[in-house]
């Protein structure tokens, strides 16, 4: 096994990096550049809990405008529920949005990444919100973990459900279970 095949398999299996079929035809320096570019990124490890019907999004494989797959945290407002395929994927999802996120923000030499380089600046979606008793449609930019971290290396791990204490409204803060 060549080093390039070993690194390719590691990148795909352990780091969830999409590697196009064309990679096998790349010249040596093209392979090095490609792998370095894909692997030299900040890392986020996201602790996810089992989905027990709470509203919200979760961890999904997403295809971007370049037809590249990546692991992303997707909010429910980003999902087209009129699309049966997307609706079924959400209904069959096993896990919920991250409870904990641990990040590595330095490169291999200890230098901080320019995190702005790894954000999806062109990402947006429309959402319906309530405003003064009326339903309005707004243009929304994704938040920190699903927009600003869109091009990070991502791993999802399962964590115990008791680490999950969602706050969807101020009344959720009154729930005594979160103060144990």
Segments predicted by a language model, with ranges:
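OB-fold and OB-like single-stranded nucleic-acid-recognition modules
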Residues: 3-180
């Amino acid at each position: 096994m060549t080093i390039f095949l070993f690194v390719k398999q590691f990148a795909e299996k352990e780091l969830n990096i999409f590697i196009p079929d064309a990679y096998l035809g790349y010249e040596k320096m093209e392979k090095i550049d490609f792998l370095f570019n894909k692997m030299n990124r900040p890392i986020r490890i996201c602790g996810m809990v089992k989905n027990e019907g709470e509203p919200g999004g979760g961890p999904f494989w997403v295809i971007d405008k370049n037809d590249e797959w990546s692991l992303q945290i997707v909010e429910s407002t980003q999902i087209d529920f009129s699309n049966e395929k997307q609706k079924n994927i959400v209904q069959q999802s096993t896990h919920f949005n991250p409870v904990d996120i641990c990040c590595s923000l330095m490169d291999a030499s200890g230098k901080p990444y320019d995190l702005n380089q790894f954000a999806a600046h062109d990402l947006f979606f429309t959402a319906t919100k309530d405003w003064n008793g009326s339903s309005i449609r707004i243009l929304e930019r994704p938040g920190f973990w699903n927009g600003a971290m869109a091009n990070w290396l991502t791993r999802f791990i399962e964590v115990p459900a008791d680490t999950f204490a969602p706050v969807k409204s101020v009344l959720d803060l009154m729930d005594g279970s979160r103060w144990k």
